[in-house]
Amino acid sequence: LLRADERERWTRILGEIAAHPDRLAQRRWQVSRAIVATWRRAGVPMMAGTDAPMPEVYPGFSLLDELERLVDAGLTPREALRTATLAPARFLGLEATSGTVAPGRRADLVLLAADPTRDIRNTRRIDAVLLGGRVLRRADLDALLQPPAMAARRTPR
């Protein structure tokens, strides 16, 4: 249960959000960009992450969105890619076996049609995935995405 002052505060905050959603979103984005820029200048390690599975946040796709936002916030595409590869391996203490492509390392790979270090949006141009020794070509990936896509179209909004 909320105290009366907490309820009043949340009523005011939610009213502001409902009245000015675009202004609030713009302000949050400005703050996020400033945080990323400050952390980058200070050398703070960053890891990409998402809130999947949450409504409207889809595993895989939400990570690609995150990488694009990190670049929009000032990271280079290479730095953004490291937030989803090497940084998590380091954080988990797996840097010796994961996080980069090298002989003897464990690796599931995403093969792209274009260089993501030139344009981070190229992470969406997936040609194939090597997963646990299996090769999944574009047609295989599209077939795997059919059931969730159909379910999403049936979900009421």
Where are the regions a protein language model picked out?
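Short aromatic-centered micro-motifs
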Residues: 129
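Acidic, glycine-enriched loop/beta-strand segments at the rims
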Residues: 58, 76-81, 90-126
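Short, charged, surface-exposed secondary-structure boundary motifs
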Residues: 121, 139-141
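Alpha-helical transmembrane segments of multi-pass membrane proteins
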Residues: 84-85
